[in-house]
Every structure is written in C-alpha cells, then in structure tokens.
C-alpha cells in the first residue's frame, strides 16, 4: 500500500487534503484520531511506532500542535473491534516514550483507548474494562511524565482520581456533546448540561475550567438536523465563556 511504501508522503498528502478547506486560516491546532485497531489483540510493532514518529516529525515541520486521541473502534456499529484491558495497558506502556519525545507538538491527550472513537461513552466499550485502571495508566504513563494536560468526556471521570491532586489538576474536558448553556430536557446525549442529571458536572467544570485546557465539538451533525436540536448562538457563547473553552470544532469529528 502507498502508506507503507512512503509513509511521510502519505501523511503529508492526507494532511493537505484534510486542511485544504482551512488553508487560508493557517491552522496550527488540530484534533487527531490515531486508530490502533489492527493491533488490538497484540503488541504494537516497531514499524507502527516508527510511522507515528514520522507523523510527529511532519507536524513539527509544519509548526502544528494536536489534541491526540488513541482509539481502536471507529464505529458504534463495530464494537467488536475494541481492545481488552490487558492490551490497552500494554499499548499505553509502549507509547510512553513516543509521547514524551513528542510532547512539544501535543497540545493535549484526549480520552482514548475506551469506547467507540475513544470517546469513553460507556455503552460503546467492548469488552468491558475498568475505567479507573485505564485512566490511572494514561495519567501515570503518558500524561504526567510528559508534562501534558489530559481531556476527558465528563467531570465524573475526572473525579475517579480526585484523591490524587497532581493527576487531578492535569485534567480538562473534551465535550463530545456540546449544545450550549440551555435547559431543554433530553439534550444531554451522554454529555452534561446545566440542569440535567449531570448538573453537578456542569457546575464543577464552571468552577475548575480556568485551570486546564477545555475542548468541545457539536453533537453529531446529522442527528442535530434530524432532531431539530439546533444550538442557539447566545447559549453557545455562554457555555464557551463559563467553561472557558480553549478550542472547539463546529463540525462533529473535527472535519
């Protein structure tokens, strides 16, 4: 395949295509999904780590930074492509030096490894894993040693390690279900809002958002159109202000 014959050119071509609609904006920050699907039941081979290093080199040459998310399953219709906890732990260990070596081009690490798209939606993780164990490994192996910040789907997950402040203080949020600061019933979609079941998450982020980078994206665009759940501009501004967003994608999946 072309990507294996000349990975550097393949990566550069893909970045060019991906960034073409935004070329006049001189993009310096992007969100990247790195799928390890082919290795979900075995170690990462040397060649995979080498290709990832080439990718980081290309970013460095282009003076870009990324929000980096490792994942296995790229569809909630293919949950069987997820990885088990033992292999997740092994891959995190294998990626430790790579992440540390390239921390200068990583804005944040995001969620990752668990669930469809690495989003940490619990209903989409197969086989089941211990979320606390995975979170601790990510923070202990990838985030803290590299001096990076980490972003999780919900403050609820952040609270898993609220008894260890050095790690807790490195965690922000990547909201995969942004609807603005509104009170409509049933709009959570496994996110959190100002008056929903996870109201405490909303209030917690309002208190803590100033101290870590926050990121978000609109909910699935097709779904928004079908359900007529269109985000109000003023409500969007209010949420971004109160939760102090550092970055945001107006198109779900960062397209």
Residue ranges and their predicted role:
Residues 1-27, 94, 100-101:
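Non-catalytic accessory regions flanking glycosidase/transglycosidase catalytic cores in CAZymes
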Residues 6, 88-93, 149, 153:
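Lectin-type carbohydrate-recognition ectodomains
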Residues 7, 11-15, 31, 35-36, ...:
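Extended hydrophobic/Leu-rich segments
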Residues 16-21, 28-73, 148:
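Aromatic-lined substrate-binding rim segments of carbohydrate-active enzymes
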Residues 34-36, 70-74, 99, 113-115, ...:
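Short, flexible loop/turn elements at secondary-structure junctions
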Residues 35-47, 76-86, 115, 119-128:
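The substrate-binding groove and active-site-proximal loops of carbohydrate-active enzymes
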Residues 47-65, 82-108, 130-142:
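An active-site-proximal structural segment forming one wall of the substrate-binding cleft
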Residues 105-255:
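Catalytic-core regions of glycoside hydrolase
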